[in-house]
Amino acid sequence: MENWSVPEDDRPYIRPARSFNPWLAVAAIGALAWALAFYFRTWLEPTPPAPPPASAVEAPAAPAAEPAIRHPLEAAGDAPATLPSLENSDSMMRDSVSRLIGGKAFADMVVPYQLVRRIVATVDNLPRRTAATRAMPLNAVPGGFAAVTNGEQTAVDTVNYRRYVPYVNVVAAIDAPALVRGYVRLYPLFQRAYEELGFPGKYFNDRLMEAIDDLLETPELDAPAKLLRPRVLFEFADPDLEMRSAGQKILLRIGPENAARVKEKLWEVRRELLAASGRR
């Protein structure tokens, strides 16, 4: 079992509750205090005469609202006339993913059940600070995480990078146009799972683009990242890295060469997604 992990959630498909934000409490208290002060002032102080009406000034035009759906997908011409329910979609998804990456890679690496829900939950979690590992559609990478200590400094051991090479090889070999064509054909299933996850009225393809863009912003490191181990799990010593999203931490963890290959494929997929939504 690795010592580097992200918090796991036994209910991966339920949208996590929003964390408590103390600034919201401060703002709420401030608003309440202002309301009470206004209430008592109107009762205890005489009402001043109304000021003369100001000359009419044309209000500045409101900025254009952002479109509700930023990356709409047109229905594929070869889309199935009817799609299975989410509960019955695993057979179709297994066939589609297996054809895309190969039967052996699928058997070795992919969790073969609740695939649509797992993919959607993982995509939604990647730009967040943490991701539920039990929701991910891939099996855990074999082997344990290794760190190297030199004096008082601990860093990622570069031997870790080799563990991810088989997974990265599969990603690098994916036919991006075929991947996006399959995604568009089955898109209603992904949308349904996203709404079920707790985002009714939100568009899953927009969230996918956000996740890809976030991954592409992962910084490139010149040397293995320094680590701290305040408790059981390792953390990045650099606060900027530790504050990064779950998806960016994955790319930082797999090493610069692996990350570069994954980013190259992400750029290809992004271009295909933009083309599928009528943009270039």
Question: How does the language model describe each region?
Answer:
Residues M92-F106, N160-A173, E242-Q248:
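Acidic/histidine-rich, surface-exposed loop or edge segments in extracytoplasmic proteins
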